[in-house]
């Protein structure tokens, strides 16, 4: 929103959500019907028929630019503006497809009102020349002066400030404008197409090719990484005045009063508004920063979960990734798209970099193993997954990372003995492997309501259930279990004086249930009304009861100084991080020398106190009484 929104700021279909595509449906259906039922090829309106396919292609093209741009800026080598992107910008730019819908509606209107457009051929050389000349002349000239006018304080405050709210640009930032401003741009950019229609030189390729050109140049200028090769300007020096670069336009977003041109910098050079640092910035960003200067201090290794999680990561759908997994209203559409994209993941033989964050002087990256939860639970895929994790550990060490955290199922005991396998195979491993058990247990303890005297522990026997049980016993909290195998497994690993707090019971009467993996809906139905389900697992339990309280998986709120966080971690809310991921960051900040994997434990109280001291805060979606002065939580 502009700082002082003017008239016609909101788009007409602002309140329709994704139903706005229904505005195009009648015209698209009628266009297809006319094309199919035409008695001869001469009667087919090619330009009208291509409107809907072009709408779909432009949506796909825009998404590809988002993915490529975010992949490049996560790598950071040719990144231009190295500032933080936030959730506010993601929300502001989520309607980037509005201008594509508006284009489709305008094309349908032109086709219906101008008979010349209904007989457009596939190709017209004259039309291509007319379009190129009119764009380089009137369009670029008028846009330059319009753009300068929009930077007048009255128009800027009411309209153009909405676009300039994004200092760190993404490809789709290019089309984020108030409705009235976008309409003016449409009138301006319609000059070449309407002129070819009026002169009878319009063609399907010319009209749609011009749209592709506009999209390409818009996305290029706002992608925030330099990719235009220097050889183009060496081969044809005048190109410098006909083609802007991402670094050239980025200066307009950081300096505001320079580099006003649309796509051709010639008018900035003519009227003396070229930023003096344009050439220097281009050379510097094209060469790229020394990757050693951006070595990750912490790498968080995660993986995909359900098929729709393909799009719920930073390289996927920006608006979807900025909300918890499963919160998107278009869930069915996501699952359908995932069915197409998921098989392609098998072609990836290594991790990909998804996020790059910063806390204080710590560089933090998130790497994703392109495999789903189903691959981790499959015996046939277990070895392949283990090799991918081992390669990621080697890559992290080669990159100079001090700490690597194993997220989700990457720390499974059957897979790698909670990460210990990689330390055993390489005793000289400099990168510290952290499974985050201590901080996860501390987060669970903090969610247990104050005054609790006994809990019911359910789930599979694993490292975190053992450490959690030990911590509860030290606090003289009775730990009940109904599973004899789990009871015997945990009891034999506790000291005799602690075993008295373990109880094998047939009763499900405890008001606090600590649930891990493997808890069924049938077991949940045995809980009393109002019982608290507190997960200690990586994955949240299925919510089988409406009359009970379900807490989130172990997590913490990140410090305010945590930069460049604009995606949600799986099912967690914004700016909330899983305890396992946070553990690695704390480990690096404290410069602890040692692994936390296998049977090694940092210490529950030690990890919790350090996390709080570093700015992390307890998180519980039901906001039970918080931590006490000694950091022990409600217990």
Swiss-Prot record:
<dbReference type="InterPro" id="IPR006694">
    <property type="entry name" value="Fatty_acid_hydroxylase"/>
</dbReference>
<dbReference type="Pfam" id="PF12076">
    <property type="entry name" value="CER1-like_C"/>
</dbReference>
<comment type="function">
    <text>Aldehyde decarbonylase involved in the conversion of aldehydes to alkanes. Core component of a very-long-chain alkane synthesis complex.</text>
</comment>
<feature type="domain" description="Fatty acid hydroxylase">
    <location>
        <begin position="139"/>
        <end position="273"/>
    </location>
</feature>
<dbReference type="GO" id="GO:0009409">
    <property type="term" value="P:response to cold"/>
</dbReference>
<dbReference type="Pfam" id="PF04116">
    <property type="entry name" value="FA_hydroxylase"/>
</dbReference>
<comment type="subunit">
    <text>Homodimer.</text>
</comment>
<dbReference type="GO" id="GO:0005506">
    <property type="term" value="F:iron ion binding"/>
</dbReference>
<protein>
    <recommendedName>
        <fullName>Very-long-chain aldehyde decarbonylase GL1-6</fullName>
        <ecNumber>4.1.99.5</ecNumber>
    </recommendedName>
</protein>
<dbReference type="GO" id="GO:0071771">
    <property type="term" value="F:aldehyde oxygenase (deformylating) activity"/>
</dbReference>
<keyword id="KW-0256">Endoplasmic reticulum</keyword>
<dbReference type="GO" id="GO:0005789">
    <property type="term" value="C:endoplasmic reticulum membrane"/>
</dbReference>
<feature type="transmembrane region" description="Helical">
    <location>
        <begin position="183"/>
        <end position="203"/>
    </location>
</feature>
<dbReference type="GO" id="GO:0016491">
    <property type="term" value="F:oxidoreductase activity"/>
</dbReference>
<feature type="transmembrane region" description="Helical">
    <location>
        <begin position="46"/>
        <end position="66"/>
    </location>
</feature>
<keyword id="KW-0812">Transmembrane</keyword>
<keyword id="KW-1133">Transmembrane helix</keyword>
<dbReference type="InterPro" id="IPR021940">
    <property type="entry name" value="CER1-like_C"/>
</dbReference>
<dbReference type="GO" id="GO:0009414">
    <property type="term" value="P:response to water deprivation"/>
</dbReference>
<keyword id="KW-0456">Lyase</keyword>
<dbReference type="GO" id="GO:0008610">
    <property type="term" value="P:lipid biosynthetic process"/>
</dbReference>
<dbReference type="InterPro" id="IPR050307">
    <property type="entry name" value="Sterol_Desaturase_Related"/>
</dbReference>
<feature type="transmembrane region" description="Helical">
    <location>
        <begin position="100"/>
        <end position="120"/>
    </location>
</feature>
<feature type="transmembrane region" description="Helical">
    <location>
        <begin position="127"/>
        <end position="147"/>
    </location>
</feature>
<keyword id="KW-0472">Membrane</keyword>
<keyword id="KW-0521">NADP</keyword>
<dbReference type="GO" id="GO:0009651">
    <property type="term" value="P:response to salt stress"/>
</dbReference>
<comment type="similarity">
    <text>Belongs to the sterol desaturase family.</text>
</comment>
